[in-house]
Curated annotation (Swiss-Prot):
Claim: Amino-acid biosynthesis is one of the keywords in the record: no
Subunit annotation: Homodimer; dimerization is essential for SLC9B2 activity. Lipids seem to play a role in the stabilization of the dimerization subdomain.
Bilayer topology: Multi-pass membrane protein
UniProt key word Metal-binding: yes
UniProt function note: Electroneutral Na(+) Li(+)/H(+) antiporter that extrudes Na(+) or Li(+) in exchange for external protons across the membrane. Uses the proton gradient/membrane potential to extrude sodium. Contributes to the regulation of intracellular pH and sodium homeostasis. Also able to mediate Na(+)/Li(+) antiporter activity in kidney. May play a physiological role in renal tubular function and blood pressure homeostasis. Plays an important role for insulin secretion and clathrin-mediated endocytosis in beta-cells. Involved in sperm motility and fertility.
Entry's localization field: Cell membrane; Mitochondrion membrane; Endosome membrane; Recycling endosome membrane
UniProt KW keywords: Antiport, Cell membrane, Cytoplasmic vesicle, Endosome, Hydrogen ion transport, Ion transport, Membrane, Metal-binding, Mitochondrion, Phosphoprotein, Sodium, Sodium transport, Synapse, Transmembrane, Transmembrane helix, Transport
Species of the source: Pongo abelii
Principal cellular location given in the protein's record: membrane
Top-rank taxon: Eukaryota
Name recorded for this polypeptide: Sodium/hydrogen exchanger 9B2
Topological domain spans for side Extracellular: 105-113, 162-171, 228-233, 291-300, 358-361, 412-417, 474-486
Length: 537
């Protein structure tokens, strides 16, 4: 012990050998001294090490406190910046929007008016989504904002004071939801990759088709015997429930993929790719069953009419898709804007006109086929069109989920109906989980990965909100009370499926992903190498 102290003292007092004495050399010498003092007695920190740690801690805390003070000064400055500036700006925009519409429409934009209700619902849905996004749990993905939008609309409808002043006509509500459905279908069609379609493995096909079809058939069976729906309406309900939600699955998969979980087996890629095909299959089945349910005549005629709607939708979509591949041509100005307007305008026209001409199931198929063929021809420009359509979706997403929530009234719900709807959703989801597990067997996944994929294929949201109210809107256009009751049951089940499965599915993916999926080994090695390099430096 004494020899070591003498050696340390000698090294500290050693004279310079002609080299320039710099602060960095002094820091290195000080760090070596502290390390050697630690080596003498590793269990008890020395006074020097304690002082060094406290000084480092103060240096780390000082910039943080300075940042908070600087932000506060910017916020309270004149003119203000930061949070206060954003709040004032957003409030001004909201008030200005209302004032401009009021100056044009008058009483329609006052409390109780139609436009007033739409504006209030729109901003309340946005605020609801933002508030839900503030709920952050450690090591878990954030809750989907669409859930906050859904709850905002539900609260507006079921709080008497607010409901008396926020009134939206059924025709306006139906039209806005149909526009949102058109945007979703365009995004789904453009999102399909023709090269990926050719390279799809059997497991991706099984995953996109098997659970959707089995859940649709199970839900139809349950709806017929538990809810008393006719078989046509049972399958409408089944295909509403059969779709998985990309709005929940894709962000969660991207988080896991960024962390390196399941990348080696391609689990996130598989789920994101199969999700699009799962949704398209559900929408196609829904449109076909919708056409059959609202057609009159014999069963054979209804089935043939459903097939005819599919043929009309595919044929019309093919013609329009090839048309907008070449018009406008690539040498025109503002090419992306023109293509975006054409694909959105034609999709909205297809959805509305199909209902007008008595073929409600053909509009959605027409939009899907048209967007897919247009995207194949646009190649590199497709991404720019998708960006603009994503902005349109950001505008209509709060309206869609807010309007879906506002359709559900507690006063009109019977307790036994709610219980049967929850039972239908629960049993159908359980069958879907088991079917998904079977579909990924013999695909090279281990038991933990199969369990994760089964639970990750659970969330429902976007498609249920988009098509869940279409049957009710179509029933209202026919003016039959019994059909409206069937449509209300379908909408209630869709609402409950979003409310139950969206948060549970998101939490399960965040909890089970790091525990059941393997992390890529080379990422860990890279981190270790980087750590060793930083220590050596």
């Amino acid at each position: 012990m004494g020899d070591e102290d003498k050696r340390i003292t000698y090294e500290d007092s050693e004279p310079s050998t002609g080299m320039n004495y710099t602060p960095s050399m002094h820091q290195e010498t000080q760090e070596e001294t502290v390390m050697k003092l630690k080596g003498i007695d590793a269990n008890e920190p020395t006074e020097g090490s304690i002082l060094l740690k406290s000084s480092e801690k103060k240096l780390q805390e000082t910039p943080t406190e300075a940042n908070h003070v600087q932000r506060l000064r910017q916020m309270l400055a004149c003119p203000p910046h930061g949070l206060l500036d954003r709040v004032v700006t957003n409030v001004t925009i909201i008030v200005l929007l209302w004032a401009v519409i009021w100056s044009i429409t008058g009483s329609e934009c006052l409390p109780g008016g139609n436009l007033f209700g739409i504006i209030i619902l729109f901003y309340c849905a946005i605020i609801g989504g933002k508030l839900l996004g503030l709920i952050k749990l450690p090591t878990l993905p954030p809750l989907p904002s669409l859930l906050g939008m859904l709850l905002a609309g539900f609260l507006i409808r079921n709080i008497p004071v607010i409901n008396d002043n926020v009134q939206i006509k059924h025709k306006w509500s139906s039209s806005l939801r149909s526009i949102a459905l058109s945007i979703i279908l365009v995004r789904a069609g453009l999102g399909l990759d023709s090269k990926a379609l050719k390279k799809l493995k059997g497991v991706c096909v099984r995953l996109s088709m098997g659970p959707c079809i089995v859940e649709a058939c199970t839900s139809a069976l349950l709806a017929h015997y538990l809810l008393g729906l006719p078989w046509q309406w049972g399958f409408i309900l089944g295909f509403v429930l059969g779709a998985v939600s990309p709005a929940v699955v894709v962000p969660s998969m991207l988080l896991l993929q960024g962390g390196g979980y399941g990348v080696e087996k391609g689990v996130p890629t598989l789920l994101m790719a199969a999700g699009s095909f799962d949704d398209i299959l559900a929408i196609t089945g829904f449109n076909t069953c919708l056409g059959i349910a609202f057609s009159t005549g014999s069963t054979v005629f209804n089935v043939l009419r459903g097939v005819l709607e599919v043929v009309i939708g595919v044929a019309t979509g093919s013609v329009l898709g090839f048309f907008i591949q070449y018009f406008p041509s690539c040498d025109q100005d503002k090419l992306v804007c023109k293509r975006t307007f054409l694909v959105l305008g034609l999709s909205v026209l297809a959805v509305f006109s199909s209902v007008h001409f008595g073929f409600p199931g053909s509009g959605g198929l027409c939009t899907l086929v048209m967007a897919f063929l247009a995207g194949m021809g646009w190649t590199s420009e497709k991404a720019e069109v998708e960006k603009i359509i994503a902005v349109a979706w950001d505008i209509f997403q709060p309206l869609l989920f807010g309007l879906i929530g506002a359709e559900v009234s507690i006063a009109s719900l019977r307790p036994e109906t709610v219980g049967l709807c929850v039972a239908t959703v629960g049993i159908a989801v359980l069958i879907r989980i088991l079917t998904t597990f079977l579909m990924v067997c013999f695909a090279g996944f281990n038991l933990k990965e199969k369990i994760f994929i089964s639970f990750a294929w659970l969330p429902k949201a976007t498609v249920q909100a988009a098509i869940g109210s279409v049957a009710l809107d179509t029933a209202r256009s026919h003016g039959e009370k019994q059909l409206e009751d069937y449509g209300m049951d379908v909408l209630t089940v869709a609402f409950l499926s979003i409310l139950i499965t969206a948060p549970i599915g998101s939490l399960l993916i965040g909890l089970l992903g790091p525990r059941l999926l393997q992390k890529v080994e080379h990422q860990n090695k890279d981190e270790e190498v980087q750590g060793e390099t930083s220590v050596q430096v």
